[in-house]
């Protein structure tokens, strides 16, 4: 199973963003991961619409957007028009998550949910038929550089085991995604990995060297 390696662009150097995008694409990454935060659902602010539009227009690889915001349904059409390929919502923020996931698909975009560490499989299982991707948070959302929460490993196993019963979604991980965790989780069937400071950014090696090493794990 080929891994999906997805650099978290919140960790990139925005003073040379075009160069970052080009280097990451040359390294062989699969999807650009773009974080949007509203300062309400999470106590931080993420990338702006102009940043996302620029990355989507500049990149030749797909882009996803992770909406850590209240009332995500209000913004689905806006992000779809910017050119994103995948939209993740947090069901914890949306009382009509089923409708919002269908809106995403109707907009011609792949749909996903991001599941907080404290949210169980049972809580979201009725949404899974409408998901192309399920991204499990292994840290509390909103900040880079946190430590992996060990108790979520069992939840990864549950979501992987149930995938075929709910339409065959791909399982992703976001948060503290180190090479050691990538190796462990890929063995149990996790497909995609959001790469931040734990695995990709701020290292002494080139992006290509790191991506090649992660592919080999």
Where are these regions (language model features)?
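Conserved, mostly hydrophobic/aromatic
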Residues: 17, 24, 35, 79, ...
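Glycine-rich, proline-tolerant flexible connector loops at the mouths of alpha/beta enzymes
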Residues: 32-49, 139-145
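Catalytic cores of alpha/beta
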Residues: 73-81, 119-129, 177-193
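Conserved anion-binding
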Residues: 16, 74-75, 85-170
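Structural motif
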Residues: 27, 58, 82, 107, ...
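Glycine-rich phosphate-binding active-site loops on the catalytic face of alpha/beta enzymes
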Residues: 89-95, 135-145, 188-210
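Alpha/beta enzyme core
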Residues: 20-34, 78-81, 124-137
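Hydrophobic faces of well-ordered beta-strands that scaffold small-molecule active sites
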Residues: 4-8, 32-34, 63-67, 87-89, ...
């Amino acid at each position: 199973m080929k891994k999906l390696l997805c650099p978290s662009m919140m960790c990139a150097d925005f003073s040379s963003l075009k160069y970052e995008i080009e280097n990451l694409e040359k390294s062989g990454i699969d999807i650009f991961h773009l974080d949007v935060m509203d300062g309400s659902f999470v106590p931080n602010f993420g990338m702006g619409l102009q940043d996302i539009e620029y990355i989507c227009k500049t990149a030749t690889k797909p882009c996803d957007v992770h909406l850590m915001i209240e009332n995500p349904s209000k913004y689905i059409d806006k992000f779809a028009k910017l050119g994103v390929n995948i939209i993740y919502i947090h069901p914890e923020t949306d009382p009509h998550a089923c409708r919002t996931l269908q809106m995403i698909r109707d907009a011609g975009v792949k749909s996903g949910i991001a599941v907080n560490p404290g949210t169980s499989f049972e809580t979201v299982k009725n949404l899974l038929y409408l998901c192309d991707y399920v991204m499990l948070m292994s840290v509390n959302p909103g900040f880079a550089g946190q430590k992996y929460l060990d108790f979520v490993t069992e939840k990864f196993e549950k979501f992987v085991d149930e995938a075929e019963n709910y339409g065959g979604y791909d399982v992703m991980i976001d948060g503290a995604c180190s090479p050691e965790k990538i190796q462990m989780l890929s063995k149990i069937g996790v497909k995609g990995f959001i790469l931040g400071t734990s695995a990709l950014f701020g290292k002494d090696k080139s992006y290509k060297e790191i991506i090649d090493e992660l592919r080999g794990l």
